[in-house]
UniProtKB/Swiss-Prot annotation:
GO biological process, one term: mitochondrial respiratory chain complex I assembly
Transmembrane segments: 2-22, 70-90, 100-120, 147-167, 171-191, 217-237, 254-276, 294-314
Keyword Nucleus: no
HAMAP family, per database record: NDH1_NuoH
Protein name (Swiss-Prot/TrEMBL): NADH-ubiquinone oxidoreductase chain 1
Family matches, as InterPro entries: NADH_UbQ_OxRdtase_su1/FPO, NADH_UbQ_OxRdtase_su1_CS
Family, similarity comment: Belongs to the complex I subunit 1 family.
GO cellular component: mitochondrial inner membrane
PANTHER family xref list: NADH DEHYDROGENASE SUBUNIT 1 (PTHR11432), NADH-UBIQUINONE OXIDOREDUCTASE CHAIN 1 (PTHR11432:SF3)
Gene: MT-ND1
Catalysed reaction, written as an equation: a ubiquinone + NADH + 5 H(+)(in) = a ubiquinol + NAD(+) + 4 H(+)(out)
Amino acid sequence: MFMINVLLLIIPILLAVAFLTLVERKILGYMQLRKGPNIVGPYGLLQPIADALKLFIKEPLQPLTSSTSMFIIAPILALTLALTMWIPLPMPYPLINMNLGILFMLAMSSLAVYSILWSGWASNSKYALIGALRAVAQTISYEVTLAIILLSVLLMSGSFTLSTLIITQEYLWLIFPSWPLAMMWFISTLAETNRAPFDLTEGESELVSGFNVEYAAGPFALFFLAEYANIIMMNIFTTTLFLGAFHSPYLPELYSINFTMKTLLLTCSFLWIRASYPRFRYDQLMHLLWKNFLPLTLALCMWHVSLPIMLSSIPPQT
């Protein structure tokens, strides 16, 4: 039964990822005053299926000088970790109800760095290695602020369980009392998922395609799936943290619809940002984090710690 539940989680994720690529191309197309894909199937609806078929029936080429085992393991690890992060997400019921669900997700997103690093190193290409090193530095840096923002939210929620956040936000979304944290969280998730304007790992002008430059066919598709699964997962996480939907045990469908609509809006805003903003310079990216976000998040975290002590003389609850 558990394996059936796992499959019922994985298959919709992969379908959502497939059609997110189509939505992205359509949105970018309309924002640039063109149609986007509209030939394969009605309104281009079969385009993701055609793309998947094309990628998976091609021969997966590999550089002669590459480290074979790591070169193959890296994309598999990337997709496995991307799918594993969905386990504790309450939609409205998680696959496994974890006590430390939030810490589990943070740990898994940290491990995703290894797949990027290994892929860049195993390719034995200087472009891939530079892209991988950039990705690692960027991901590790932005995880610092993500962790501090999470801690601040947990101090308001009082638990490390994601399901508790639904109860916390029954009367008021956490985006209202903590909107500076929500803004910084959203920008940090953009950087964490290597999306524009922070897609310096794939800087076409200087790095061709970044850490996956030597990958083709199936392994490239696995990286692609992992990236888009992470985007949807991060937006679901944002919705759970700051835009909690009302949950009635008698009508869980209403929660799921509400939840999905909010996640879809956030995902579309990711694509809107990609169409609107140019890429950051690397030093500006690091400056934004270490000089702006980190002091602000630390100050707000201290505020959340001291508030219950000042007002009610009780220690912060987690």
